[in-house]
Amino acid sequence: LVEYLSNKNSMNDQEIAEHFQMLKSLQTNFAQIHRNHVKIKANSLNILLASHDDTTLEDVVCSAEDGCTLAEFPTTLEAAKFCREYRISIMMGTPNLVRGVSHSGNISARDLASKGLIDILSSDYIPSSLLMGAVKLGLIRKNLALGLQSVTQFPAEAAGLEDRGTIE
C-alpha cells in the first residue's frame, strides 16, 4: 500500500504516515458506530449479514457476535476452521478454486475444498467460472452433486430463498 500511495498519489513518507493516521482515526471514531447501524438495519429488514476476509479467530468471533451466517472469502485456514466451529457458511470464489491460487496471496480455495471447508462458490466477478468451479469442487470432494449444489441450492438456502436452487 505504501508503494501504491507513493506511486499513484506522489506521496512522500510523511504524507503516507499522516494518511494512515487519518484512516486509523476514522476507524477509531466511526467503525463501531457504522457496524452497529448496519446490524440494526439488517436485523430490522431480516437481511443476511456476511463477513468479508476474516483472518483470525477474533475476526470470526466478531462476525458471529454480529449475527453473520456467511463468511465471504476467509483468508486463512484458521479462519475457515473457526467459521465451521461457529456454524458460519463458507463462500469462496471460483476463480481462486479453478486457478488453485488466490490472486491476493490468501488461502487457496483448493486447500479449503480438500478439507471440506467450502459450502458456497461465487463467481467473484467472473460469472463464466461458476460451472467450471462447481465441477472442480465436485472432483476435489469426489461428489459432483455437492459441487453443483455449491452454486445452486446452498447459496439459495444461505440467503433464505427456500423456493429456489433445486429442481424437483
Feature annotation, model-predicted:
Residues 58-59, 78-79, 107-108, 166:
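Short acidic active-site motifs
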Residues 1, 54-56, 76, 95-97, ...:
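Active-site beta-loop-alpha junctions enriched in small/polar residues
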Residues 86-96, 100-168:
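His/Asp/Glu-enriched, well-ordered alpha-helical/loop segment
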Residues 1-54, 65, 124:
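Metal-coordinating catalytic core of metallo-dependent amide/deamination hydrolases
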Residues 29-33, 50-53, 71-80, 99-105:
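A general structural motif
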Residues 1, 49-51, 70-72, 90-93, ...:
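Hydrophobic faces of well-ordered beta-strands that scaffold small-molecule active sites
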Residues 57-71:
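Acidic, glycine-rich loop-and-beta core segments that form the ion-binding/anion-interacting portion
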